[in-house]
Amino acid sequence: MSKPTSSAMPQSNEEKFINHLMKNWKKSVARKIYADALKEIKKAGHMNPSVVVQAAIENASPNVMIKSKRIGWAVYQVPVEVKPAKRFFFATKWILDAARAKTWKPMSEKLAEELIAAYGNQWAAVKKKEEAHRMAEANKAFAYMAKYVN
């Protein structure tokens, strides 16, 4: 009986989040920012910071997105279901973009604020998700074309 092999080690969501947070290949800096953000969340009165992070990512992750499909001369905005890996990617991207857009604070504080806000279903990352869902709802008439979109 042979062992199943894999080319890459599976990563936890925490490691993926740190990789998305990383800039200029400085993973140690990203880990420190993430750890400081968890401490800030703990200071804010939340018992388990990792639960807050998971719930914030879940609240900010989209279920449906819009993809463009050209048929003839017309371009249709087709709503398609988002795969779990892409959901995580978009949620972390939107949370980090919202945190980076803020100014005059250390990144760990900005990240902690954004995670707490996404945990409570408010602020920028959740608004991006709601906007994506609104666009999908508006273009629901073209949902039958989803099987033609890659």
Positions of PLM-derived features:
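Strongly charged
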Residues: 1-24, 28, 35-150
